[in-house]
A protein has these predicted regions:
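Vicinal oxygen chelate
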Residues: 19-20, 78-123
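Conserved short beta-strand elements that form part of the metal-binding/catalytic scaffold
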Residues: 34-75, 123-128
Length: 138
């Protein structure tokens, strides 16, 4: 019998945020994410939010409010479809409102990738596999 953790089907990273409202604005406006939830609801100063993108919210990130002295930036990787990776990079670069910390490049380890930084310093690396297996046209 397989170990019980072999049934895992999703991972949700949790980042810290110095302003949930600013985080919501950045991820929805600049990166195209959708809001999954905010806590407390109907509050002008939320302490938590869930943001997602992709089918069935497959790329989901939680953000918790953190005091500046306790803040530590995080990072996560998000796989995109074959055609969408380059198109998204061109969109982000062309608009010039998002800090690109790593330009789009094919890597020796078999990924084509680029990375962006949010307003708090959290880094998202968007990638696709060079050998195929990505959704979309290879």
């Amino acid at each position: 019998m397989a170990h019980p953790t072999a049934s895992a089907w999703k991972i949700i990273p949790q980042f810290q945020s110095l302003s949930i409202n600013r985080t919501l604005q950045f991820y929805t406006t600049e990166l195209g994410f959708q809001t999954g939830g905010v806590h407390p609801e109907n509050n002008s100063n939320p302490t938590f939010c869930s943001l997602f993108t992709g089918p069935k919210a497959e790329a989901n990130i939680y953000f918790r409010l953190c005091e500046a002295g306790d803040f530590h930036a995080g990072s996560a990787w998000i796989a995109l479809g074959t055609a969408e990776l380059d198109a998204f990079y061109e969109k982000v670069k062309g608009e010039g409102r998002v800090t690109i910390v790593e330009e789009l490049e094919d890597k020796a380890w078999g990924y084509r990738q680029f990375a962006v930084k949010d307003d708090d310093g959290n880094v998202l690396t968007f990638f696709k596999f060079l050998e195929g297996g990505n959704p979309g046209t290879d």
